[in-house]
C-alpha cells in the first residue's frame, strides 16, 4: 500500500472541486468539518426514482454504477460548504473508479466475473495543511491474486501526472 502526498494543495483542490478531473468517479462518502460538519453518502436511493428513470439510468451506466452518485453530482454541495477564507479543518473524500475505469485499468488481467473484481478506491484526506491520497483495492471475495491493488496504485499515479498534479510517495512503513 502506498500513500500519495500532494505537494500543491491549491492546484489539487481546484481539480477536485472546480474542474472536471474527478467528475466521472463514483462517490462512496465525503465529509468536511468547518464551523459545522457535512457528511455526504454516495449511495443512490432507488426509491427516489420512478421505475422508468431507474431502468434508464441503470441501462446507461450499468447496475453497479447506477447505485452511486458521481462526484460531479455532489461536488458543488461540498464546494459551497467549504468555500471562504479559511481552509476546512478536515476534508475527506472517498471515490471509487467506475466500472468502465476499472475495466480499463485491469483489462483482462483477471479471469473472474465482473462482480468478483475489486473496487478501486481513492481516499483523499486534507487535514493539518497536508493532503494525502490512499489508493485501495477492495475485494468482494477471496482472490489469491492481489495484483489489482498494485495496478490501481500505478494507474492512479499516472492519472495524477497526466493532470499535472504534483505529488510524492510517503514512506508508510
Task: Go through each PLM region and give its residues.
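Charge-rich, low-complexity N-terminal segments
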Residues: 1-71
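Context-gated lysine
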Residues: 10, 19, 41, 75, ...
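Generic "edge-of-domain/loop-turn" microfeature
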Residues: 27, 32, 100-102, 131, ...
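General "foldedness" signal
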Residues: 52, 62, 68, 80, ...
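Surface-exposed, low-hydrophobicity interaction/linker segments
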Residues: 61-130
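Mixed-charge, glycine-accented linear interaction segment located at domain edges/termini
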Residues: 131-173
Amino acid at each position: 500500500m502506498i500513500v500519495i502526498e500532494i505537494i500543491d494543495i491549491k492546484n489539487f483542490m481546484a481539480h477536485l472541486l472546480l474542474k472536471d478531473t474527478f467528475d466521472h468517479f463514483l462517490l462512496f462518502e465525503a465529509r468536511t468539518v468547518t464551523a459545522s460538519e457535512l457528511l455526504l453518502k454516495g449511495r443512490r436511493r432507488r426509491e427516489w426514482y420512478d421505475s422508468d428513470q431507474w431502468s434508464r439510468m441503470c441501462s446507461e451506466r450499468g447496475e453497479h454504477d447506477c447505485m452511486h452518485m458521481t462526484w460531479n453530482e455532489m461536488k458543488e454541495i461540498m464546494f459551497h460548504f467549504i468555500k471562504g477564507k479559511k481552509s476546512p479543518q478536515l476534508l475527506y473524500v472517498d471515490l471509487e473508479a467506475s466500472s468502465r475505469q476499472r475495466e480499463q485499468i485491469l483489462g483482462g488481467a483477471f479471469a473472474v466475473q465482473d462482480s468478483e473484481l475489486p473496487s478501486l478506491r481513492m481516499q483523499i484526506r486534507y487535514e493539518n495543511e497536508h493532503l494525502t491520497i490512499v489508493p485501495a483495492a477492495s475485494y468482494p471475495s477471496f482472490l489469491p491474486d492481489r495484483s489489482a491493488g498494485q495496478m490501481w496504485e500505478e494507474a492512479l499515479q499516472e492519472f495524477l501526472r497526466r493532470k499535472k498534479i504534483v505529488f510524492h510517495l510517503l514512506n508508510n512503513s
